Amino acid sequence: MDVNPTLLFLKVPAQNAISTTFPYTGDPPYSHGTGTGYTMDTVNRTHQYSEKGKWTTNTETGAPQLNPIDGPLPEDNEPSGYAQTDCVLEAMAFLEESHPGIFENSCLETIEVVQQTRVDKLTQGRQTYDWTLNRNQPAATALANTIEVFRSNGLTANESGRLIDFLKDVMESMDKEEIEITTHFQRKRRVRDNMTKKMVTQRTIGKKKQRVNKRSYLIRALTLNTMTKDAERGKLKRRAIATPGMQIRGFVYFVETLARSICEKLEQSGLPVGGNEKKAKLANVVRKMMTNSQDTELSFTITGDNTKWNENQNPRMFLAMITYITKNQPEWFRNILSIAPIMFSNKMARLGKGYMFESKRMKLRTQIPAEMLASIDLKYFNESTRKKIEKIRPLLIDGTASLSPGMMMGMFNMLSTVLGVSILNLGQKKYTKTTYWWDGLQSSDDFALIVNAPNHEGIQAGVDRFYRTCKLVGINMSKKKSYINKTGTFEFTSFFYRYGFVANFSMELPSFGVSGINESADMSIGVTVIKNNMINNDLGPATAQMALQLFIKDYRYTYRCHRGDTQIQTRRSFELKKLWDQTQSKAGLLVSDGGPNLYNIRNLHIPEVCLKWELMDEDYQGRLCNPLNPFVSHKEIESVNNAVVMPAHGPAKSMEYDAVATTHSWIPKRNRSILNTSQRGILEDEQMYQKCCNLFEKFFPSSSYRRPVGISSMVEAMVSRARIDARIDFESGRIKKEEFSEIMKICSTIEELRRQK
């Protein structure tokens, strides 16, 4: 049946139809090839906005650096990064005046966190620049490699397991004249295969030691690797994002902890909360402004957009902010927090893989690595690339570009929010000392500004003053992209406000559908997404019911598990029909085994196995939930799992769903081809690391809450825990005497082996 789309809108208020204009159906665009060009764009753009600053040379690395701080005040509307130190400090002082004790309390909270955080905090997060191998790695591997190198260079403070001690090692590593690292390389040789008698290439992975001098080490420690941001909708051009290395990460974490603690106490901050909590917070600010604008006052709201937020932020400003926020705090604490901005003032951007060249005529392809861009003849490049390279050349050192001004994407979201809020805070009448006043919301680079005044001229004057105040701290409100409306209608972080927040349902569209993890998880995730959208996003009962039917249909086509009594022929239909015929209670079969769907919008919260358990044949129950079933490699299933769902904007969200372990919870095996590459050594390291961590979790399940504290190795901690548990179990009669003595014997053997090592 064809539906005339205009009919859909007859009964819908205009603001609810906003979601249909979003570019959120279909696949998002992904980037291909290298991000080198995008990174050069970022570096060049950042320098352009600060071009009237002062040039200096870093004495350690020889990198040229541009410092725009306290530079000339802009005379036009072009974006610029010339923040004025005294203005930033004053904004901080006024923020503290309006919120007495806010900085002090946040510092105390952060000091506590700093003293307690374990180094394994750094294993969170995805790709991390691994300076030992000069490329990206999973965070856990990159951390393990860093610690291994530190250890072999005599830096062992980190073995206490505290993050702060690891950071001491980082500081000491920067003073060393040289550092020895282990890198992976691969050898290829031609050998004759015994079976086929053909010649084959055999690859072996070697590890080799390499010495790095102080300058090279510093460059690596200060390097941010860059990648292209994928899956970004509604944009024509891609852009680069940065992944910092392990040396920077810990310091950034502490700064962001402090800033997060401050943001939590600021009513104008859209971070760190999200979802419904964020909506409630925002609605409060709007309510305050609307109730205060009595009948005599006008109230307008700007849906704001800042031009090139990251490129105009400056680490030197962040240093000034931190210095102010942490005044009167212990010296060690002030030092540890000031290191992140200092490192960012000296950061280097790695240009990525370089350029690919191909000659159609000679069928040749060759890669020009980023390291060669400094010296290669530019005649091979097209006009625009040539300009980029010419501009960036003076900044290049070893394939990285010196990038002192600017903050790469997503590094100091919380701290930059504090800066934004400090300007919103200046809108109170006691500061504007006139008839207009403002307030608003800030979340990283996104803002909404509410201005109240007795007449239109006052509104205009208020907006102008806000605009100019922002310029003083390096924030550039875009006059082209911001728009003003009567208060009551605006957009902030993709939430649409119209006398209350309107559900922007289209943003959730990408997360509907079959995830492709396995039959068990996919069913659970699918119904949970529908349930969550009924709770949070105005998904009505009729639409939800339809979404559910579409999901089941999609699910059956994905796993070829149509009902046992259907006429549809697939590869699985023969087996499923057989199962259907020999099952007495057909309602008990899971959908993935050709059973009927028993879900409706009232029971979405119940896992399918539980929903059908009473209806199942006994032998089916036995097969389905049998951990000894030889056809299933089981992962241990927690009662709640996390799935990654892709909402339409922002990062992938983690969503909890109920996981019931059945024979359908299989895990696909790793692709074999990786085992023949240079990644193999790394993969083995990673699996070892994983195994150790899993074992450790067994001894100290997160339910026991307290992490082992104190200076002991993982092995020692596990042995002592095993002894304590064994004694308790023995005394309470849960284990026999023989078992108890065997456990004690194993513990002693382990300790003996450690001593011999």
From Swiss-Prot:
<keyword id="KW-0597">Phosphoprotein</keyword>
<comment type="subunit">
    <text>Influenza RNA polymerase is composed of three subunits: PB1, PB2 and PA. Interacts (via N-terminus) with PA (via C-terminus). Interacts (via C-terminus) with PB2 (via N-terminus); this interaction is essential for transcription initiation.</text>
</comment>
<feature type="compositionally biased region" description="Polar residues">
    <location>
        <begin position="55"/>
        <end position="64"/>
    </location>
</feature>
<dbReference type="GO" id="GO:0030430">
    <property type="term" value="C:host cell cytoplasm"/>
</dbReference>
<dbReference type="GO" id="GO:0003723">
    <property type="term" value="F:RNA binding"/>
</dbReference>
<dbReference type="GO" id="GO:0042025">
    <property type="term" value="C:host cell nucleus"/>
</dbReference>
<feature type="region of interest" description="Disordered">
    <location>
        <begin position="50"/>
        <end position="82"/>
    </location>
</feature>
<protein>
    <recommendedName>
        <fullName>RNA-directed RNA polymerase catalytic subunit</fullName>
        <ecNumber>2.7.7.48</ecNumber>
    </recommendedName>
</protein>
<dbReference type="GO" id="GO:0019083">
    <property type="term" value="P:viral transcription"/>
</dbReference>
<dbReference type="GO" id="GO:0039694">
    <property type="term" value="P:viral RNA genome replication"/>
</dbReference>
<dbReference type="InterPro" id="IPR007099">
    <property type="entry name" value="RNA-dir_pol_NSvirus"/>
</dbReference>
<keyword id="KW-1262">Eukaryotic host gene expression shutoff by virus</keyword>
<keyword id="KW-0808">Transferase</keyword>
<keyword id="KW-0548">Nucleotidyltransferase</keyword>
<comment type="function">
    <text>RNA-dependent RNA polymerase which is responsible for replication and transcription of virus RNA segments. The transcription of viral mRNAs occurs by a unique mechanism called cap-snatching. 5' methylated caps of cellular mRNAs are cleaved after 10-13 nucleotides by PA. In turn, these short capped RNAs are used as primers by PB1 for transcription of viral mRNAs. During virus replication, PB1 initiates RNA synthesis and copy vRNA into complementary RNA (cRNA) which in turn serves as a template for the production of more vRNAs.</text>
</comment>
<feature type="region of interest" description="Promoter-binding site">
    <location>
        <begin position="249"/>
        <end position="256"/>
    </location>
</feature>
<dbReference type="GO" id="GO:0006351">
    <property type="term" value="P:DNA-templated transcription"/>
</dbReference>
<keyword id="KW-0945">Host-virus interaction</keyword>
<keyword id="KW-0693">Viral RNA replication</keyword>
<feature type="short sequence motif" description="Nuclear localization signal">
    <location>
        <begin position="187"/>
        <end position="195"/>
    </location>
</feature>
<feature type="domain" description="RdRp catalytic">
    <location>
        <begin position="286"/>
        <end position="483"/>
    </location>
</feature>
<comment type="similarity">
    <text>Belongs to the influenza viruses polymerase PB1 family.</text>
</comment>
<keyword id="KW-0696">RNA-directed RNA polymerase</keyword>
<keyword id="KW-1035">Host cytoplasm</keyword>
<dbReference type="GO" id="GO:0000166">
    <property type="term" value="F:nucleotide binding"/>
</dbReference>
<keyword id="KW-1104">Inhibition of host RNA polymerase II by virus</keyword>
<keyword id="KW-0547">Nucleotide-binding</keyword>
<keyword id="KW-1195">Viral transcription</keyword>
<keyword id="KW-1191">Eukaryotic host transcription shutoff by virus</keyword>
<feature type="short sequence motif" description="Nuclear localization signal">
    <location>
        <begin position="203"/>
        <end position="216"/>
    </location>
</feature>
<keyword id="KW-1190">Host gene expression shutoff by virus</keyword>
<dbReference type="Pfam" id="PF00602">
    <property type="entry name" value="Flu_PB1"/>
</dbReference>
<keyword id="KW-1048">Host nucleus</keyword>
<dbReference type="GO" id="GO:0039523">
    <property type="term" value="P:symbiont-mediated suppression of host mRNA transcription via inhibition of RNA polymerase II activity"/>
</dbReference>
<dbReference type="GO" id="GO:0039657">
    <property type="term" value="P:symbiont-mediated suppression of host gene expression"/>
</dbReference>
<dbReference type="GO" id="GO:0003968">
    <property type="term" value="F:RNA-directed RNA polymerase activity"/>
</dbReference>
<dbReference type="InterPro" id="IPR001407">
    <property type="entry name" value="RNA_pol_PB1_influenza"/>
</dbReference>
